């Protein structure tokens, strides 16, 4: 097993419903440690930059609009196989397809407002972490 870091966003819908603590509890219960976290209200420019890979997709405008509609929690998680573990905790992108007990099954209303984002690979995690956090903001959890 590999100790990894992954990136997570608690999206505006879940923040508005006060699900931050419950979502963080799921991460920690599953053995992931929070090594950085902050609440931010994304600007249009910041959201467009983060989701640039989707800029040609038909849902891009709606995605940016949603992600700028309220504050989000950006978080760095650390643990054994953190990327895969976080994706399992989140569940399928479409909450209608998500297994019971996953974050999206429990907290998401639709595929468009699906509560959480998580990196899909170690490489994208590193890129996404660097987009929101400086190295000195990441706190090693040795205890």
Curated annotation (Swiss-Prot):
Gene3D superfamilies: Nucleoside diphosphate kinase-like domain. Its EC number is 2.7.4.6. One of its GO terms (cellular component) is cytoplasm. It comes from the Bacteria. It is found in: Cytoplasm. GO terms for biological process: CTP biosynthetic process; GTP biosynthetic process; UTP biosynthetic process. InterPro entries: NDK-like_dom, NDK-like_dom_sf, Nucleoside_diP_kinase, Nucleoside_diP_kinase_AS. It catalyses: a 2'-deoxyribonucleoside 5'-diphosphate + ATP = a 2'-deoxyribonucleoside 5'-triphosphate + ADP; a ribonucleoside 5'-diphosphate + ATP = a ribonucleoside 5'-triphosphate + ADP. ATP binds at residues 11, 59, 87, 93, 104, 114. Its cofactor is Mg(2+). Signal peptide: none annotated. GO terms for molecular function: ATP binding; metal ion binding; nucleoside diphosphate kinase activity. It is an enzyme of class 2 (transferase). Keywords: ATP-binding, Cytoplasm, Kinase, Magnesium, Metal-binding, Nucleotide metabolism, Nucleotide-binding, Phosphoprotein, Transferase. The active site is at 117 (pros-phosphohistidine intermediate). Transmembrane segments: none annotated. Pfam families: NDK (PF00334). The keyword Transferase applies. Homotetramer. Major role in the synthesis of nucleoside triphosphates other than ATP. The ATP gamma phosphate is transferred to the NDP beta phosphate via a ping-pong mechanism, using a phosphorylated active-site intermediate. Belongs to the NDK family. This is Nucleoside diphosphate kinase. It comes from Pseudoalteromonas translucida (strain TAC 125).
């Amino acid at each position: 097993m590999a100790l990894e870091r992954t990136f997570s966003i608690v999206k505006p819908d879940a923040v508005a419903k006060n699900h931050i603590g419950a979502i963080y509890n799921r991460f920690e219960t599953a053995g992931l440690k929070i090594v950085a976290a902050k609440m931010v209200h994304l600007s249009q420019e910041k959201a467009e930059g983060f989701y640039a890979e989707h800029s040609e997709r038909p849902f891009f405008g709606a995605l940016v609009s949603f992600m700028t509609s309220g504050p989000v929690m950006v978080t760095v998680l650390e643990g054994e196989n953190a990327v895969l573990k976080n994706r399992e905790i989140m569940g399928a992108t479409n909450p209608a397809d998500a297994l019971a007990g996953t974050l999206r099954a429990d907290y998401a209303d639709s595929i468009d407002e699906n509560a959480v984002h998580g990196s899909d690979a170690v490489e994208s995690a590193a890129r996404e972490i660097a987009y929101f956090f400086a190295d000195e903001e990441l706190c090693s959890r040795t205890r």
